Amino acid sequence: MIDNKIHQYIEKERSKPFVWGSRDCNTFVLNFIDSIYNLDLEKKVKGKYKTEFGAIKFQKNFGQYLSEYLISNGGKKILPTQATIGDILIIKKGVYELGHICLGALVAGCLEHESIVIGRVQDFNSF
């Protein structure tokens, strides 16, 4: 049942464009977690920045990376090789982290200048 909810979420979000602060890699992941587990994690982030520079500034003021925020709200750290459908995969890129959703052998992420990108897990670090 949860696999079905995950795939429904991805299909619903696939065509939506990237927008800093409301539809970027981190809000995509937080909204996903909220919709699957009936939480409200995205509200602390959504709409707080509108540019990449704004995201970096917000990150500094927020005081937690995405991974730390998820762990402080009940998540746990695992190796990417242990990820299963619905797990969150995070890439550290410079001064911030990029969140993605594991779909089994595939991974979904929201990248700038694109809508949802789906790629193979083994290509995960090249996103």
Per-range role (PLM):
Residues 51-118:
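...with weaker cross-activation on analogous glycine-rich loops/strands in unrelated enzymes
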Residues 1-64:
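N-terminal capping segments
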